[in-house]
Amino acid sequence: MPVLLDTHAFLWWCEDSPELSLKARKVMTEEDCFVSYVSFWEIAIKLNLGKLRLPGIPDRYLASQMSLNGFEQMEISFRQIMRCASLARHHGDPFDRLLVAQAQEKELAVVSRDAVFDVYGIKRIW
């Protein structure tokens, strides 16, 4: 089953962080993994605010990690953006709300430690 990676899951995979659960690691090794453009947007904002640092030049680093790990990019559609308007307000984070909309539309599980995905009826792997 293909999976959509939450931003932290993608970054922790790239860093080989111990924060990433063993179950998440297993799934990310065995399944097709998608990283949404919304995660790249979130990363760019955090870089700009000084809340995140990446080794090397960010766009080159992220592109090389995507290629090296065989992850696929997921574009954001108008329909997915508009789907956010109908989501219950369980989660205020606009990045995660868009990941919810994408996961629902594409029927994907989400790799995330954030339990708020559970209330949207999405399979969460952690």
List the predicted regions and their residue ranges.
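Acidic active-site catalytic centers that drive phospho-/nucleotidyl reactions
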Residues: D6, E42, D96, D114
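Generic structural signal for small/hydrophobic residues in well-ordered secondary structure
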Residues: T7-H8, I43, C84, A103
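Short, well-structured N-terminal submotif of metal-dependent ribonuclease cores
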Residues: M1-S36, L49-S64, K106, A115
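Active-site neighborhoods of divalent-metal-dependent phosphate/nucleic-acid chemistry enzymes
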Residues: P55-A63, S67-R113
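Phosphate- and divalent-cation-binding pockets in alpha/beta enzyme and binding domains
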Residues: E42, R83-S86, V119-Y120
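Active-site regions of enzymes building and remodeling cell-envelope glycoconjugates
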Residues: G121-W126
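Short glycine/serine/threonine-enriched helix-capping/active-site loop
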Residues: V35-V38, I76
